[in-house]
Amino acid sequence: MRYRKFGRTGWDVSEIGYGMWGMGGWSGSDDSESIGSLQRAIDLGCNFFDTAWVYGNGHSEKLLGQIVRANPSRKLHVASKVPPKNNAWPAPGNSMLEETYPPEHITQFVDQNLLNLGLESLDLIQLHSWNDGWLEDSRIGTALEKLKSSGKVRAVGLSLNRWQPWNGVKAVRAGLADSVQVIYNIFDQNPEDELFPACRENNVAVIARVPLDEGSLTGTLTASSRWPGNDWRNKYFSGENLQETLKRVGALKALLPSGMTLPELALRFILSNPDVSTTIPGMRKTRNVEMNTAVSQNGPLPADLLAELRKHRWVRKVTPESFAAKVKRKLRSFLPTR
């Protein structure tokens, strides 16, 4: 496993981190399997783990706390998130801080995060949605600094809205965040335009999420792909989106060098960008842990292949069937009304 600096924190984090959204009780999740996969990742050098309260009302956090306590001799970086008070994803453009992240709400949920994890402090706490307009309210900066000075958290970050990597650039330049979490993959390359340069200039860490594009870049989707029950992927990969996705994935498969899988291509594309501190694929099964962590040893992609992949940027249209709309409904079902 290779390690990278996590921005101005100076932490050495594994460039393949661990995204724990799928361990919050979603379809197909199994706690014993999850614990086994987490331990295997640790044994293979993974030391950065990203969770959130909304991943099963703290269930994912409890699993992470369990595995951290089972490995007391290893330095594992724990990152979690505070949901917005109004339970709205993505953050409405006209929302005010009082509706989303008033200081007392942030403090309350950090205490809940720590209780679920069974830990005394967090390495990184992130706001689970963000709008640069909230910078106009000075309370947000004060609240986050108080958290760090209290010793409850070591660093603070922002999880940016899907399709809005620009909506966080002001916060980065203002020095509010130690890290940003953003969707970045072969299709979603927009963070390279404004966000990554701002992070580079201000020594802010970048967490690349959704590296496999909700599963399309595993290369296993077909025209008949379906998921159990009301799994959100049935909406996301439906109709024209599924057909267009399959077409674009097929074009990527045609570029694969001999012996390289599509997931390896996708992860190495991300890791070829030095602005990325870590990427956090979801890995509920041990075999996926082993395949994904092994990618780290292969290094960046060849320059000519990387240049070809730059041509595959895809700006999806936001529709009612989009993940953003689906996750908003799903997460509201997890959260209490306040």
Role assignments for model-derived ranges:
Residues 29-41, 100-117, 162-171:
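Short, acidic/polar
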Residues 1-76:
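N-terminal binding-site loop/beta-alpha segment at the start of enzyme catalytic domains
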Residues 74-87:
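A short, structured active-site edge motif that brings together acidic residues
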Residues 114-133:
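Active-site groove signature of glycoside hydrolases
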Residues 57, 129-321, 332-338:
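Beta/alpha (TIM)-barrel catalytic core signal, keyed to glycine-rich beta->alpha loops juxtaposed to Asp/Glu
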Residues 86-100:
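Surface-exposed, active-site-proximal loop segments in enzymatic domains
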